[in-house]
Regions:
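Non-catalytic positions within long, well-ordered alpha-helices that form the structural scaffold/packing
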Residues: 4-5, 26, 92
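N-terminal glycine-rich phosphate-binding loop and ensuing alpha1 helix
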Residues: 1-15
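Conserved core of the sugar-phosphate nucleotidyltransferase
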Residues: 49, 53, 65-68, 77-167, ...
Length: 178
């Protein structure tokens, strides 16, 4: 619903290979102008390939070529209309090729450890002591993690780079609870 209520989106299009999802999406007001091919519908399908399929289909079948494309993954449903509109405003203001939503990481990267099959603990990046993370939490550098809620791409940049994180990528910081 956040996408349908956003004033910055011309169209809300769902890409799916599932008839039930397509019907529900249309019932709630989204468009499903095509069904996603099965080769782009498995767990290992790269997002960029799914996006490129949608862009090409819309261009070839409707002569529709948007300036921006926003990926809103259904696995991150807590984004708001305001999040969508603010991330779009950031893209315009910064002339960004991409805006991706993030949240402050709960853990410092150097506190992340690996555990072997026999339960032995080892450093992932480097020793927390060597990394200087035994300082107060307030004095540490902040780190951010992708939260999967918003991926906004300038379509021409996506087509040129064929990658999800082009050079001119900015972040839209969301609160941890979303």
């Amino acid at each position: 619903m956040a996408a349908l209520n956003a004033n910055v989106l011309d169209r809300v299009i769902v890409s799916t290979d599932d008839d039930e999802i397509a019907n529900i999406s249309q019932k709630w007001g989204a468009e499903v102008p095509f069904m996603r091919p099965s080769e782009l519908s498995n767990d290992n399908s790269p997002h960029v390939d799914v996006l490129l399929h949608a862009i090409r289909w819309l261009h070839e079948n409707e002569e529709y070529f948007p300036e921006f494309l926003m990926l809103l993954q259904p696995t991150s449903p807590l984004r708001t209309t305001e999040d969508i509109e603010k991330s779009f405003a950031l893209a315009i203001e910064r002339k960004a090729d991409c805006v991706i939503s993030v949240q402050e990481s709960l853990s410092h990267p150097y506190t992340v450890m690996q555990v072997s099959e026999d339960q032995k603990l080892s450093e992932f990046l480097m020793s927390p002591k060597d990394a200087g993370v035994y300082q107060s939490r307030q004095s540490r550098t902040k780190y951010y993690s992708l939260n999967g809620a918003i991926f906004l791409f300038r379509v021409d940049a996506l087509l040129k780079k064929l990658m999800v994180y082009p050079e001119s990528t900015f972040t839209y910081v969301m609160p941890e609870e979303r």
